[in-house]
């Protein structure tokens, strides 16, 4: 298989894993595009993306335009004379002129089985919706948002123990393998492009902190899915005793209750059971303000009086 001259475009750690796979392959990465350096941390110091750091460490030219809509940036990209552009969580829109510039166009690695979850948060939305599987799709990019023809798909079962953090890690391992397979298939002409079924498409909206507020008027099953989806960010929470209490781990209890949603049914070192609109949710790991996440046994040792049975937890949706 003849080596390809590749432009790579990506920004976060998830993308850097794919760049590393390309660097380890026989292909040539001739240029890297990534988002401009951003202020980060308490000191708001300008910080390079993980992709930029990896590219610099490997002496690969780095390009950080604020947009690819302007002609000078487009001409600069065209001058690289790439065979293909690989895009992974880049964060900038690619206009048609850019998509058409490389000989083989632009391909994207997306963290879901398309067309199920298009958009910014496919890993989180799969958990949020209670999906039984997820995976990676490599697609030929077009001007739409994750609407291009699918070149290769891999699947992965979603376990009850999975959170967004664990799925992210699994897909960050699966994605680079799929990418290299897709590049080989493109060169060999063995990939059959598959159109997406628009009727099956959903948009995976970005998560918000407000959305992470636990609404006890939902079912225990839905809240369990949300807690897993919002771990590690923005982290599910509820207001109680004037404090925001984060919830990192829960499970659906076999206990039944007719108590009003948000009512504590029981509190022991095994968990705090809370009534919901449908079923009972057991809180297993929580975080008090300014503290580290703790198992419920330690929370009760510190603030047991907050979680007495029959206490009603705050809920703005009451």
Curated annotation (Swiss-Prot):
GO cellular component: cytosol
Keywords: Protein biosynthesis, Transferase
Stored PROSITE patterns: GART
Residue sites binding (6S)-5,6,7,8-tetrahydrofolate per the record: 112-115
Pfam family, one: Formyl_trans_C
InterPro entries: Fmt (IPR005794), Formyl_trans_C (IPR005793), Formyl_trans_C_sf (IPR037022), Formyl_transf_N (IPR002376), Formyl_transf_N_sf (IPR036477), Formyl_transferase-like_C_sf (IPR011034), GART_AS (IPR001555), Met-tRNA-FMT_C (IPR044135)
Gene3D superfamilies assigned: Formyl transferase, C-terminal domain, Formyl transferase, N-terminal domain
Catalytic activity reported: L-methionyl-tRNA(fMet) + (6R)-10-formyltetrahydrofolate = N-formyl-L-methionyl-tRNA(fMet) + (6S)-5,6,7,8-tetrahydrofolate + H(+)
Top-level EC class: transferase
Family annotation (CDD domains): FMT_core_Met-tRNA-FMT_N (cd08646), Met_tRNA_FMT_C (cd08704)
UniProt EC number: 2.1.2.9
GO molecular function: methionyl-tRNA formyltransferase activity
PANTHER family: METHIONYL-TRNA FORMYLTRANSFERASE, METHIONYL-TRNA FORMYLTRANSFERASE, MITOCHONDRIAL
Entry function: Attaches a formyl group to the free amino group of methionyl-tRNA(fMet). The formyl group appears to play a dual role in the initiator identity of N-formylmethionyl-tRNA by promoting its recognition by IF2 and preventing the misappropriation of this tRNA by the elongation apparatus.
Family designation: Belongs to the Fmt family.
Protein name: Methionyl-tRNA formyltransferase
Gene source species: Shewanella baltica (strain OS195)
Chain's gene name: fmt
């Amino acid at each position: 298989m003849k080596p390809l001259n590749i432009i790579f475009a990506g920004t976060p750690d998830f993308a850097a894993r794919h760049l590393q796979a390309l660097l380890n392959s026989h292909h040539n990465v001739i240029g890297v595009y990534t988002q401009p350096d951003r202020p980060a941390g308490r000191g708001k110091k300008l910080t390079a993306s993980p992709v930029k750091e990896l590219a610099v460490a490997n002496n690969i030219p780095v390009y950080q335009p604020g947009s690819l809509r302007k002609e000078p940036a487009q001409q600069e990209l065209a001058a690289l004379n790439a065979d293909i552009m690989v895009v992974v969580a880049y964060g900038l829109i690619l206009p048609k002129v850019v998509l058409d510039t490389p000989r083989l166009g632009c391909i994207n690695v997306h963290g879901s089985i398309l067309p199920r979850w298009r958009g910014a948060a496919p890993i989180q939305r799969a958990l949020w919706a209670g999906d039984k599987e997820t995976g990676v799709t490599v697609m030929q990019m077009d001007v739409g948002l994750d609407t291009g023809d699918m070149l290769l798909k891999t699947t992965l079962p979603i376990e009850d123990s999975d959170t967004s953090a664990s799925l992210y890690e699994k897909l960050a391992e699966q994605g680079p393998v799929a990418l290299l397979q897709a590049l080989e298939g493109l060169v060999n002409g063995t990939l059959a492009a598959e159109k997406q079924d628009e009727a099956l498409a959903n948009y995976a909206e970005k998560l918000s902190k407000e959305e992470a507020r636990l609404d006890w008027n939902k079912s225990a099953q839905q809240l369990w899915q949300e807690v897993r989806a919002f771990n590690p960010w923005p982290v599910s929470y509820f207001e109680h005793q004037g404090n925001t209490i984060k919830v990192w781990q829960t499970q659906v209890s076999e206990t039944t209750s007719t108590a009003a949603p948000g009512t504590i049914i029981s509190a022991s070192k095994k968990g705090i059971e809370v009534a919901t609109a449908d079923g009972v949710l057991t809180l297993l790991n929580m975080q008090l303000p300014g503290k580290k996440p703790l198992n419920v046994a330690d929370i009760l040792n510190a603030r047991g009086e907050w979680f007495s049975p029959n206490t009603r937890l705050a809920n703005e949706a009451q």
